[in-house]
Amino acid sequence: MSGHSKWANIKRQKGAADAVRGKIFTKLGREIQIAVRMGGADPSSNSKLKDVIAKCKANNMPNDNIQRSIKRASGETDGSNYEEITYEGYGPGGVAVICECTTDNRNRTAGDLRHYFDKFGGNLGQSGCVSYMFNKKGVIVIEKNDKVNEETLMMEALDAGAEDFDSDDNCYEIITDPADFSTVREALEAKGYEFIEAEVSMIPTTTTKLTDPEQIKFMDKLIEALEDLDDVSNVYHSWEQDEENEEE
């Protein structure tokens, strides 16, 4: 267990923005729409849709909502035409930030992002300015409980093709190559495991610690503001938060 990603330390805990379930489901519905448009409405033949559905389930999206989103995407009745686009920038203290967005208006999205980066002491950069500081990996997180045996889970994950396995006080973390993510996730799902997280993510190769109280405050507000934007699906960053900062 190398622990190279330290997911629990670098991924912001689901905060006030993600507490609004309707907002999460709206964002996931957009991801479903794009997946259906790219590969059809049948998850058995559309691996992207299958992965999005797994992400929906990890976020406790009811199956009825998932199926309605797929049907709506198949019909394209509302005329919306969403696309996926990634923006990059720097937060306070040079923290690298990546925002994965699903939008029907690039200008609106870029304007909203720029506003918050500027407001909280960062700046929106050019494409590629920070992405080289991250590795794209599949991430599966399983809660620790009496039903899960750590050694068994580790062996089953590695046998299915996982690259790495780690754990902390609360959960187990499984890292995969993006190409192997679906295979590993499906193998563990078939064995009855339930996931807290199950998605392809961006993991920083190095992290940045902030010591200035104002920078810490602004960085926290920046992430919260970005996550709260309807167009933003995922926010990744290189900020290594102390436990006391995560709890605030």
Swiss-Prot record:
Swiss-Prot/TrEMBL keywords: Cytoplasm, DNA-binding, Transcription, Transcription regulation
Question: A GO molecular-function term, please?
Answer: DNA binding
Annotated Gene Ontology cellular component terms: cytosol
Give the GO terms filed under biological process for this record: regulation of DNA-templated transcription
InterPro entries according to UniProt: Integrase-like_N, TACO1_YebC-like_2nd/3rd_dom, TACO1_YebC_N, Transcrip_reg_TACO1-like, Transcrip_reg_TACO1-like_dom3, YebC-like
Can you say where in the cell this protein is located? Answer: Cytoplasm
Does the keyword section mention DNA-binding? yes
What PANTHER family does the record point to?
TRANSCRIPTIONAL REGULATORY PROTEIN YEBC-RELATED, TRANSLATIONAL ACTIVATOR OF CYTOCHROME C OXIDASE 1
Which NCBIfam families did the record assign?
PRK00110.1, PRK12378.1, YebC/PmpR family DNA-binding transcriptional regulator
Give the family, as the similarity comment puts it: Belongs to the TACO1 family.
Entry protein name:
Probable transcriptional regulatory protein Ccel_0181
What species is given as this protein's source? Ruminiclostridium cellulolyticum (strain ATCC 35319 / DSM 5812 / JCM 6584 / H10)
